[in-house]
Swiss-Prot record:
GO terms for molecular function: RNA binding; tRNA pseudouridine(38-40) synthase activity. InterPro entries: PsdUridine_synth_cat_dom_sf, PsdUridine_synth_TruA, PsdUridine_synth_TruA_a/b_dom, PsdUridine_synth_TruA_C, TruA/RsuA/RluB/E/F_N. The active site is at 54 (nucleophile). It holds the Pfam family PseudoU_synth_1. Belongs to the tRNA pseudouridine synthase TruA family. GO terms for biological process: tRNA pseudouridine synthesis. SUPFAM superfamilies: Pseudouridine synthase. Formation of pseudouridine at positions 38, 39 and 40 in the anticodon stem and loop of transfer RNAs. Keywords: Isomerase, tRNA processing. This is tRNA pseudouridine synthase A. It comes from Aster yellows witches'-broom phytoplasma (strain AYWB). Its EC number is 5.4.99.12. Substrate binds at residue 112. Gene3D superfamilies: Pseudouridine synthase I, catalytic domain, C-terminal subdomain, Pseudouridine synthase I, catalytic domain, N-terminal subdomain.
Amino acid sequence: MQHFFYKLILSYDGTFYCGYQKQPQKKTVQQTFEKALKKMTHQNIPTFAASRTDKGVHSQGQTLHFQTTFSLKPKHFQKTLNYLLPPDIRVRQMHFATPNFHARYSAKSKIYQYVFSKKPLNAFNHHFQIFADKFDFVKITKALKFIEGTHNFFAFTSETQPKNFSKTIFQASLKETVHKYILVFHGNGFLKYMIRFLVGSLIEIGKNKFSLEQFQAMLLGNKTKKATLLAPAKALVLKKIFY
């Protein structure tokens, strides 16, 4: 029986989901997507994603792959899935994939963004931003430069088991628009809660509660101090996966 391989880019508002990955008795993005996929194909099809985003984290560029005996042109597949999915989950692109493509293991790098509002939050942005209340973004910009390069990020993850805590960050920068400050992180991979702990430390630096020297020392892999402030999930978005 012939199998067909598909790759797709998924966007979602993570506000009302317990993260991306399936969990027993919990509403997740993966569970919701696979339910729509089953309704369409009448098959139980496992899907594989590039990133297991946390509860409340959003995506504009999550990449998935799956294989099935169900044959349909990708554009028609995409249209039907979007009809079956709730409005806070959308298939942005869908293509045929090669049999050796893997959404997670074929990925070369990822871009995440963390968004601050310059003004108090309102009904239209409070699920997607946090308020930048009296932050020193000059200091934050200096701290961002320390993040670039290859470092041991043990101090910025909840993971404690023996493993390689080394990651390479190609870009850690600040973009400013009329209404927002946007932190951009482009790296070859990220540990659990790594970006949110980094942002939490940057917030403390921006509020003069934490020094640049202390932050730089933590990036040397010093295991005597861990980041303590976990930035809210709602302002974090997975922007793009590179292959």
